[in-house]
Amino acid sequence: YITPVNSLEKHSWYHGPVSRNAAEYLLSSGINGSFLVRESESSPGQRSISLRYEGRVYHYRINTASDGKLYVSSESRFNTLAELVHHHSTVADGLITTLHYPAPKRNKPTIYGVSPNYDKWEMERTDITMKHKLGGGQYGEVYEGVWKKYSLTVAVKTLKEDTMEVEEFLKEAAVMKEIKHPNLVQLLGVCTREPPFYIITEFMTYGNLLDYLRECNRQEVSAVVLLYMATQISSAMEYLEKKNFIHRDLAARNCLVGENHLVKVADFGLSRLMTGDTYTAHAGAKFPIKWTAPESLAYNKFSIKSDVWAFGVLLWEIATYGMSPYPGIDLSQVYELLEKDYRMERPEGCPEKVYELMRACWQWNPSDRPSFAEIHQAFETMFQESSISDEVEKELGKRGTRGGAGSMLQAPELPTKTRTCRRAAEQKASPPSLTPKLLRRQVTASPSSGLSHKKEATKGSASGMGTPATAEPAPPSNKVGLSKASSEEMRVRRHKHSSESPGRDKGRLAKLKPAPPPPPACTGKAGKPAQSPSQEAGEAGGPTKTKCTSLAMDAVNTDPTKAGPPGEGLRKPVPPSVPKPQSTAKPPGTPTSPVSTPSTAPAPSPLAGDQQPSSAAFIPLISTRVSLRKTRQPPERIASGTITKGVVLDSTEALCLAISRNSEQMASHSAVLEAGKNLYTFCVSYVDSIQQMRNKFAFREAINKLESNLRELQICPATASSGPAATQDFSKLLSSVKEISDIVRR
């Protein structure tokens, strides 16, 4: 008689007699959903499931019913243990989570040195103790762990079982095995013999660069520190350039920060080894639109030059302490605007040399962009010059002396200071109702305007557009010629701008501008970017679809090649008083001084509509640009000290009441707009009172949504006041009001 082998032993999840403590030890190297089934040592014949979730191990007794069936939850009973495990691997049904990954058995033989596929990077997952989850990655989750052998804290990237991206995950590991540089995150090992797959890398103390920039102490992370960070990233990318790798997802969210402002490039999920000049992504591949070069959006073509474009956007993120690129612009509009020669403006306080480098990275033709070797050399040159912080301090101090705001402008921090005095002076010639969003659209209507006003912002500086020649090593001779021609062209634009009408100026500049390479068919242009919004999730509060409506209307109706004053088609439908509070609709508890102040300053309003002088369209662009750290300050801005949390909350309630009364046909559409304008003005004044930086970001985004919704209601009052469209429009407005209220209450 031969005793039959216990059929349970063939299952990877069955561990036989194992104590509770031993089960917890075996699961210490697992992740959410790691489990085992064991026989109780203290109670022979009794079995339990041990399941790990969020750093804890949960134990569930497997019960036997009177009819011999097995169950954990009495509602679901099974004939065999295998059936029970299979059921709970698809639905939790009483467990903390579903059963995903069987824990490795203690006596599993090693195959090191025996397998023909032996890999020196492969390590036993039992060598790693998993701790808490740090966040999500390209294909799975990232955990903090400890490498037991060395008591070393590590980061462990895992693959989500349901992503079916095993091949892509293993490609990332393959890339990391080939690279080693002080500013690239170092691979320590992999576990790829069985799921769950692990990539183990060094642990970076301060997490990703995007969150670090948004939450850092700006006295400590000064202009020089920001420059040092950019230098390190350019060094890492120069190394990848030499090794013929492309990253394809270069952004602040994919860089990590360690001690002493050490920065390393990470997240190689989209990286590829180049075998030719370009890499063509497969159809349906998703990319972060705002960081992706035009040729990549249009044709799915990637090269090291498309990484250079992304580096320019990353520089802009650094210079703005983590602002989301193209603020207020919908994803579907980005490619169209870039094609019309729109580029993001120079962040406040950003040195001209650094901005010129950004603009060089954003050349439409990939061949016109600098190499990473040139970029790195340019940063090394700038960093060795102590004048970089002096330049920032000088620019900020210069603005401070214009109107006695020097006390706000002392520290040499890049984008955190506002151009208060400059705004006050320039607002005399510009209508208060022109919002940053509208001004950006005027840039699309006249590509030259974006360049002209940048010149005005840096007037008196000796650098100008010729700065890249000194800020970075000279590129090949044809590039130098192009740079000089570009510099001459800019001088021509600047002088023509002051002496000619915008309509004529625009026509001439259109002739000067070299034609970009032919983009794809119209459907491809608009379609490509719109397909890939998913990776925008890495942004903090990116623009919402709400903003798309008015922007799309204006973009369609505006042809930059037509004669006439730029932005004419845009100004007509935009009434002049969106941000202006109305004294007739005071929310309860509102102090008298904030309301009376704006209502006594109506002087600029006649110029805000169709009668605005055409030349004034160019003047306020630099002063009213959107800044992450400061909202624009129209002349009627109320002193922030007079606007309290209660005032804002009362104003939100007043707007909700006006909407409710309008729905019941007890109040007019204009009453809703009036209450909305009051709320907008109070919010703009209140934003600087918010201490927590993350809340401040969210609040600014909410203000932008509110402004966009008010504009839509104001442009289309007939639609908004009748039929089912009213509910939809007011629901958008109510959503932004609720968002504002929630943030203020935090």
UniProtKB/Swiss-Prot annotation:
Biased composition (Basic and acidic residues): 498-508
Residue span, Protein kinase domain: 128-379
Catalytic activity reported: L-tyrosyl-[protein] + ATP = O-phospho-L-tyrosyl-[protein] + ADP + H(+)
The protein's Enzyme Commission number: 2.7.10.2
Cleavable signal peptide: none
Broad EC category: transferase
GO molecular function: ATP binding; non-membrane spanning protein tyrosine kinase activity
Low complexity compositional bias, start-end: 592-602
SUPFAM superfamilies: Protein kinase-like (PK-like), SH2 domain
Domain SH2 positions: 13-103
CDD domains, alphabetized: PTKc_Abl, SH2_ABL
Kinase activation loop, short sequence motif: residues: 267-291
Protein name as annotated: Tyrosine-protein kinase transforming protein Abl
Species this protein is from: Abelson murine leukemia virus
Gene giving rise to this polypeptide: ABL
